[in-house]
Amino acid sequence: MNLFRFTADVAHAIAIVVLLLKIWKSRSCEGISGRSQLLFALVFVTRYLDLFTNFFSFYNTAMKIFYLVASFGTVYLMWAKFKATYDRNNDSFRIEFLVIPSMILALLINHEFIFMEVMWTFSIYLEAVAIMPQLFMLSRTGNAETITAHYLFALGSYRFLYILNWVYRYYTESFFDPISVVAGIVQTVLYADFFYLYITRVIQSNRQFEMSA
């Protein structure tokens, strides 16, 4: 495992921990899209179906368990424990418009037409667009708490670092996975406008994050 992948995994873990701490400490999930969190949970479930059948390393298994537990923990906090604080009115993105096309694409374009491989491919496609309900919610409300902006920035950084990981692996191992690379680029592009606003408004101006009108 190279430095880019490890740093990406750290950024991803930080994003998840920041989100969980934000919800738990504030006793509120205001500003967080429950629909995006459901999609992320679905991503991890379909990606890690091999958890109990294939063992690659302790690190790999530990990270799989962490992602599964954390994602379901987030869903529980949002949809059960603190559901009274969940802003359903602004979290209205139709997630079936993401799930169904991702599944169709996974059935059509995959490495091998077997169940585990199709599910893995589905998770890659779905993860690329799973943040859209959150960004849609952010565009509707017009602003977000600084801690929520930090969460989104860490999440976007994780995917960007994975792109660097793939570039590194291409030049050092001649490894190239077009499905992962294209999906990763799409996911990073979705964050582009958010990154710009985050850097100019939250980092440089130290203000609450606000979307442009």
From Swiss-Prot:
GO terms for biological process: IRE1-mediated unfolded protein response; protein retention in ER lumen; protein transport; vesicle-mediated transport. Belongs to the ERD2 family. This is ER lumen protein-retaining receptor erd-2.1. PANTHER family: ER LUMEN PROTEIN RETAINING RECEPTOR. The chain crosses the membrane at residues 3-21, 36-53, 62-80, 97-110, 118-137, 150-168, 179-199. Residues 22-35, 81-96, 138-149, 200-213 are cytoplasmic. One of its GO terms (molecular function) is ER retention sequence binding. Required for the retention of luminal endoplasmic reticulum proteins. Determines the specificity of the luminal ER protein retention system. Also required for normal vesicular traffic through the Golgi. It is a multi-pass membrane protein. One of its GO terms (cellular component) is endoplasmic reticulum. InterPro entries: ER_ret_rcpt. It is found in: Endoplasmic reticulum membrane. Residues 1-2, 54-61, 111-117, 169-178 are lumenal. Keywords: Endoplasmic reticulum, ER-Golgi transport, Membrane, Protein transport, Receptor, Transmembrane, Transmembrane helix, Transport. It comes from the Eukaryota.
